[in-house]
């Protein structure tokens, strides 16, 4: 099946298999991509497969070309300059190297460096140099360089860097001495009768040797010889008597503080040369040597001049300027680049004569340049777009795949480029993105919630603005209805200005952007459990059901009571109590009763025997209701704890149990549930929640719901989360501060200026723990507490009877006043004092009756004035927040009313792209950079404009940077001509390939016939 073929072509059927080859060549070889349908996984994979194949093909050709160049077959080596020190020499060399690097391998076929002679020569030099140096290093241990001066000279020469320009001059510019090498080494006496003598004994190289006083001989002998590395007096003791040889050096060095530098070396070299010339026998020899050097230089100049003039026989001095192939003047011609103003050649630039040839090699020439241009254009990919979008992930994939194409891509939107398809349009090469005049481009606005929403995490309910990537957020699986805690993939925050959708009912309170996806059921059938993500604006004024329950699929958890070390007897011996695994149902019942109305205490008592103090660790559980007391006694017996009942208190003296429960005894305002509670199964959560209701004061509002009160905000949030794990729902509400409260422990009313958290629970959803289920407690008949305001007493009269951790209050006025405009303030104090009661807050948690069908209906009449039960659009300006996470649904609450809602990532929309594109321009390594890098739009303009789903005309698309030009008739004609040239090129190339195959086949057939 061809790659990147639209589905409409699939309808051609399989009875024409030959057509598939032509379609493949049309798509792959001609590099045409059609995006003309919903961008699903199948089409995305086909298109990206095409683009990756194109990239790999281009890349393989590039690697082949680089491999050819690296092999040295068509690559020339660097030229070593063999003379001349002109000022233009370096510039000419760099220009020549630059041009040589830009030459194609076809041009190099006619170049001097085709055979790579310089590379081979250099390689041989390095090889011989390395071999010889290894031999010298090995044999140096058997001889002394002072005895073998020629070996020393050889070692010095081999240590030179042959890449330097002076490598072949056999002397170094940094030499400190220029005296004859034989006078400095122990090669015999200076008065050796076998040595030719001069009148002053200094000239050992006489004219009789017929070398015409080669002026470089002393420097060759002293090549790379550093004076500071050797002690000449030790090398040749005979030099000790010749102090005049060193006076020329020592005096000058001492004047400069004994330091050598380049200027000093130059001075010493000149002095040594002058001293050597003064001691020569005859000026005639010196004259001959100078004349010889001058003649050689003049001869070279004449030779270069003749060669240059022969090459430029026509218009040899084109001083008017040179016009390149593009028609632009580039100043003096390469022919006159090495000339003076009078037209004479600058012979110090020995490579100026070769500039014309280099220019000839690199200038674009006819068919070769046209073919290269055509090959480069043929690598471009043409993407034709007419799509309503699709998966944002697939849109990102197509966009990124277009970036692989080195030659670039041309994108053309014909009808619609919506949502994720706009990513493909923006992914084209900037400057080559076109839209037709009637085309529409659609991008999504950001979708999020305001900062007064809280999100359920493993840390409890936290503001959405405080959620981080490290938090585990409650998410819902839409297929199974199961909830889990997972890390969000992204957290979003950006400024928003525009209309917001607000809905308020008895169980729902949300304030979101109009395109935020609500997780609702739009049918009237209560048995229909199919919930979908629908934009908030589309449900305005309609009857929908929100989902606020979930399935908590966990296995039963086994709690382990930790071991404890105990100091026993007067011997101060330490004994440890091993950890125990209590029976879970009994433990959950006990823990719920104790956390509701229990506390711990430690008492030091003196023993009668030795009058020493003994610590007694007590766990106390307080309860006044007899039915609940029966459950407490059954639970303690099953757990194996010894207890003593004294009135309303059950006392358990057990250090191991006390050690575990004592950290939770921090006062009523600081209650919380431990972490192991969130590992319980759904059934275990029901048992714990039921025991909490048994232990605390419960006010029965009707036969279906129970109200649980607590002064701890954290504990109220934990109860709400526990209710969700148990399979039901909860709603936390703020109530007005009551004036008369009732203490069920002391059985008397108290007057405090405070509010409480109230939990209203459906009693039919749970059963009390009992050995006989038939004796399940009827909470509505036994736990109802009513307030008689007439018999109220003051708090001062009963404060001594109130336990700090078991103070549970109800109020005489059951009317709830929901306060949506204020948030609960956290109370961090440990003890429940009068001041704390005055400053604390009262909240109510509502738990619905039927956990299986706990949907909340929102019936809205848009014609009625907006009230707390209506939905409406409200203008808003400020920050908004959202999450992108797995399963696309997370648990959120506002003003204590929790529901499941959609997040900012869903298959089929590119909304999350625009959420991050509000941060454009932070240039993060994020997918959202797609739009920011393609549009070049500043952040404040994006924020101002993206307040709706953005349907852009062709002009607006260009204005906002998603495209570069309107594809008018003229532009379309240019695109057609461009594609026609590319198609013709590929047709010609394909035809040549077929002809070569035919010729090969015909030749094989002829041979077989013969």
UniProtKB/Swiss-Prot annotation:
Domain DOD-type homing endonuclease: 590-728
Keyword Protease: yes
Free-text description of this protein's post-translational modifications in UniProt: This protein undergoes a protein self splicing that involves a post-translational excision of the intervening region (intein) followed by peptide ligation.
Compartment list: Plastid, Chloroplast stroma
Biased composition (Low complexity): 90-100
Reactions accelerated catalytically: Hydrolysis of proteins to small peptides in the presence of ATP and magnesium. alpha-casein is the usual test substrate. In the absence of ATP, only oligopeptides shorter than five residues are hydrolyzed (such as succinyl-Leu-Tyr-|-NHMec, and Leu-Tyr-Leu-|-Tyr-Trp, in which cleavage of the -Tyr-|-Leu- and -Tyr-|-Trp bonds also occurs)
Region ranges (Disordered): 73-100, 182-209
Keyword Signal found: no
Residues forming the catalytic site: 419, 444
Region (Insertion IS1): 60-377
Main location, first listed in the record: plastid
Physiological role: Cleaves peptides in various proteins in a process that requires ATP hydrolysis. Has a chymotrypsin-like activity. Plays a major role in the degradation of misfolded proteins.
UniProt record similarity statement: Belongs to the peptidase S14 family.
PANTHER family: ATP-DEPENDENT CLP PROTEASE PROTEOLYTIC SUBUNIT, ATP-DEPENDENT CLP PROTEASE PROTEOLYTIC SUBUNIT, MITOCHONDRIAL
Protein name: ATP-dependent Clp protease proteolytic subunit
Taxonomic source organism: Chlamydomonas moewusii
Organism taxonomic ancestry: Eukaryota, Viridiplantae, Chlorophyta, core chlorophytes, Chlorophyceae
Gene responsible for this protein: clpP
């Amino acid at each position: 099946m061809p790659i990147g073929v639209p589905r409409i072509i699939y309808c051609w059927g399989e009875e024409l298999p030959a057509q598939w080859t032509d379609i493949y060549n049309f798509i792959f070889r001609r590099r045409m991509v059609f995006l003309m349908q919903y961008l699903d996984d199948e089409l995305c994979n086909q298109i990206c497969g095409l683009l990756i194949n194109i990239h790999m093909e281009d890349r393989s050709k590039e690697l082949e070309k680089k491999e050819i160049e690296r092999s040295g077959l068509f690559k020339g080596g660097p030229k070593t300059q063999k003379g001349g020190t002109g000022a233009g020499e370096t510039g000419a060399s760099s220009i020549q190297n630059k041009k040589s690097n830009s030459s194609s391998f076809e041009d190099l076929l006619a170049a001097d460096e085709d055979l790579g002679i310089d590379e081979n020569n250099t390689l041989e030099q390095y090889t011989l140099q390395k071999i010889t140096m290894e031999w010298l290093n090995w044999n140096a241990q058997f001889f002394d360089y002072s005895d073998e001066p020629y070996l020393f000279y050889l070692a010095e020469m081999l240590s030179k860097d042959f890449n330097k320009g002076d490598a072949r001059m056999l002397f170094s510019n940094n030499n400190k001495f220029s005296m004859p090498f034989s006078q400095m080494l122990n090669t015999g006496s200076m008065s050796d009768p076998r040595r030719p003598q001069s009148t002053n004994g200094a000239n050992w190289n006489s004219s009789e040797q017929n070398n015409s006083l080669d002026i470089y001989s002393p420097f060759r002998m002293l090549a790379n010889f550093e004076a500071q590395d050797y002690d000449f007096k030790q090398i040749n003791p005979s030099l000790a008597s010749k102090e005049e040889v060193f006076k020329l050096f020592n005096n000058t060095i001492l004047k400069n503080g004994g330091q050598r530098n380049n200027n000093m070396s130059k001075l010493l070299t000149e002095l040594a040369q002058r001293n050597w010339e003064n001691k020569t026998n005859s000026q005639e020899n010196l004259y001959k040597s100078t004349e010889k050097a001058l003649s050689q230089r003049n001869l070279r100049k004449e030779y270069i001049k003749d060669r240059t003039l022969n090459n430029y026989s026509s218009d040899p001095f084109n001083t008017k300027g040179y016009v390149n192939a593009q028609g632009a003047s580039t100043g003096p011609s390469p022919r006159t680049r090495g000339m003076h103003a009078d037209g004479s050649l600058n012979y110090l630039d020995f490579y100026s004569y070769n500039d014309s040839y280099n220019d000839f090699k690199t200038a674009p020439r006819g068919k070769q340049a046209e073919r290269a241009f055509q090959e480069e254009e043929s690598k471009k990919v043409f993407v034709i777009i007419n799509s309503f979008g699709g998966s944002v992930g697939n849109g990102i994939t197509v966009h990124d795949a277009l970036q692989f194409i080195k030659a670039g891509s041309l994108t053309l939107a014909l009808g619609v480029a919506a949502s994720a398809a706009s990513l493909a349009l923006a992914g084209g090469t900037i400057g080559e993105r076109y839209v037709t005049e009637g085309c529409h481009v659609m991008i999504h606005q950001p979708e999020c919630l305001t900062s007064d929403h809280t999100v359920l995490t493993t840390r409890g309910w936290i503001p959405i603005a405080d959620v981080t990537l490290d938090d585990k957020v409650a998410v819902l699986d839409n297929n199974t209805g199961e909830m889990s805690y997972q890390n969000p993939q992204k957290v979003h925050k950006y400024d928003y200005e525009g209309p917001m959708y607000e809905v308020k009912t008895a169980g729902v309170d949300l304030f979101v952007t109009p395109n935020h996806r609500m997780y609702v059921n739009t049918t009237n059938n209560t048995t229909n459990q199919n919930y979908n993500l629908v934009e908030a604006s589309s449900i305005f004024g309609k009857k929908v059901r929100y989902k606020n329950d979930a399935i908590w699929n966990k296995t039963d958890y086994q709690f382990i009571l930790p071991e404890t070390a105990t100091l026993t007897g007067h011997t101060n011996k330490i004994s440890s109590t091993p950890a125990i695994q209590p029976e879970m149902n009994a433990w959950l019942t006990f823990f719920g009763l104790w956390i509701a109305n229990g506390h711990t205490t430690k008492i030091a008592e003196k023993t009668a025997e030795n009058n020493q103090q003994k610590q007694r660790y007590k766990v106390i559980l307080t309860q006044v209701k007899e039915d609940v007391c029966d459950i407490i006694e059954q639970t303690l017996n099953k757990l194996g704890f010894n207890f003593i009942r004294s009135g309303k208190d059950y006392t358990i003296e057990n250090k191991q149990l006390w050690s575990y429960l004592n950290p939770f005894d921090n006062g009523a305002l600081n209650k919380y549930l431990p972490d192991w509670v969130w590992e319980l199964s759904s059934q275990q959560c029901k048992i714990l929640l039921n025991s909490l209701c048994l232990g605390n004061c419960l006010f029965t509002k009707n036969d279906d719901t129970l109200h649980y009160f607590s002064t701890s905000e954290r504990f109220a949030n934990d109860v709400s989360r526990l209710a969700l794990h148990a399979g039901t729902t909860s709603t936390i509400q703020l109530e007005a501060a009551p004036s008369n409260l009732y203490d069920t422990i002391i059985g008397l009313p108290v007057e405090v200026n405070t509010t409480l958290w109230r939990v209203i629970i459906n009693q039919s959803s749970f059963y009390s723990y009992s050995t006989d289920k038939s004796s399940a407690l009827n909470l509505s008949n036994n736990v109802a507490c009513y307030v008689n305001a007439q018999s109220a007493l003051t708090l001062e009269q009963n404060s001594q009877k109130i336990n700090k951790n078991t103070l549970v209050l109800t109020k005489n006025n059951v009317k709830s006043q929901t306060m949506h405009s204020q948030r609960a303030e956290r109370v961090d104090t440990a003890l429940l004092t009068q001041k704390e009661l005055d400053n604390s807050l009262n909240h109510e948690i509502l738990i619905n009756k039927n956990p299986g069908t706990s949907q909340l209906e929102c019936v809205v009449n848009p014609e009625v004035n907006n009230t707390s039960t209506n939905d409406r659009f409200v203008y808003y300006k400020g920050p908004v927040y959202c999450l992108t996470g797995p399963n696309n649904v997370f648990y959120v609450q506002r003003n204590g009313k929790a529901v499941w809602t959609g997040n900012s990532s869903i298959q089929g929309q590119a909304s999350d792209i625009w959420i991050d594109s509000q941060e454009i321009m932070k240039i993060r390594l994020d997918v959202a950079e797609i739009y920011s890098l393609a549009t070049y739009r500043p952040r404040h303009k994006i924020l101002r404009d993206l307040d709706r789903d953005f349907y852009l005309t062709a002009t607006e698309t260009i204005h906002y940077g998603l495209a570069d030009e309107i594809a008018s008739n003229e532009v379309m004609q240019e695109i057609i001509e461009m594609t026609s040239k590319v198609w013709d090129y590929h047709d010609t190339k394909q035809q040549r390939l077929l002809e070569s195959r035919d010729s090969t086949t015909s030749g094989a057939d002829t041979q077989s016939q013969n």
